[in-house]
Amino acid sequence: MILLRHGESVWNLENRFTGWTDVDLSANGVEEARLAGKILKNEGYQFDKAYTSVLKRAIRTLWIVEEMMDLVWLPVEKRWELNERHYGNLQGLNKAEMAKQYGAELVHQWRRGYGIEPPPLDNSDPRHPRFDRRYAGLAPEALPASESLKKTLKRVIPCWKQHILPDIAAGKELIIVAHGNSLRALYKHLEGLSDQEVMELNIPTGIPLVFELDSAFRPTAHYYLADSEKSQVVIGDTAH
């Protein structure tokens, strides 16, 4: 199984909180996706199905990977549950500016804390997902106005158990293209990380992460498909 965080987005580049805002890839993000596809092809990976979110930066990353691997026919299941963590009223705001306004420690807790939710969107805010057509079929109470990583986990893990895991059990080779925090949530579940340990975990953009699973679907190994020097550089910190 391959986990892949989308390539760098325009708002990653601008150091903004992104969350559910549907921003596109930056030029560098497109190149990251192309490189990921090239690496996967060169390593001989083949897939039977792909999962992604309903946000274009993840979808476009998957498109590019498929094209690079000559897998444009690949069945794709788009799941809103794989969306990035919702950053509430912080979405669109610059993190450095927020640190000056609210203090670096509070902003760090908003970003990396496990159970802390950023200030929520008002229900009348046009940025609220209730006004977005792609979520029209969901119950209003399912749509977040803000999320902690803990809350994100509560939608990602049911998606894993109800949709992704049955495909793995059926013998399908999968690629999951999603977001920093939805992948952190899945990583926490798979590896049994503590709440404190997951706070220190960062998933870099555009680098394929391999998870090898045993017959009981427990991880036996995980590793990035990239040279160690690049991994060390990008794993440090990337805006969400």
Swiss-Prot record:
The record marks H179 as: Transition state stabilizer. It holds the Pfam family His_Phos_1. GO terms for molecular function: phosphoglycerate mutase activity. The keyword Isomerase applies. InterPro entries: His_Pase_superF_clade-1 (IPR013078), His_PPase_superfam (IPR029033), PG/BPGM_mutase_AS (IPR001345), Phosphogly_mut1 (IPR005952). The active site is at H6 (tele-phosphohistidine intermediate), E84 (proton donor/acceptor). GO terms for biological process: gluconeogenesis; glycolytic process. SMART domains: PGAM. Keywords: Gluconeogenesis, Glycolysis, Isomerase. The keyword DNA-binding does not apply. Pathway: Carbohydrate degradation; glycolysis; pyruvate from D-glyceraldehyde 3-phosphate: step 3/5. Substrate binds at residues 5-12, 18-19, 57, 84-87, 95, 111-112, 180-181. Its EC number is 5.4.2.11. It catalyses: (2R)-2-phosphoglycerate = (2R)-3-phosphoglycerate. It comes from the Bacteria. Catalyzes the interconversion of 2-phosphoglycerate and 3-phosphoglycerate. Homodimer. Belongs to the phosphoglycerate mutase family. BPG-dependent PGAM subfamily. This is 2,3-bisphosphoglycerate-dependent phosphoglycerate mutase. It comes from Nitrosococcus oceani (strain ATCC 19707 / BCRC 17464 / JCM 30415 / NCIMB 11848 / C-107).
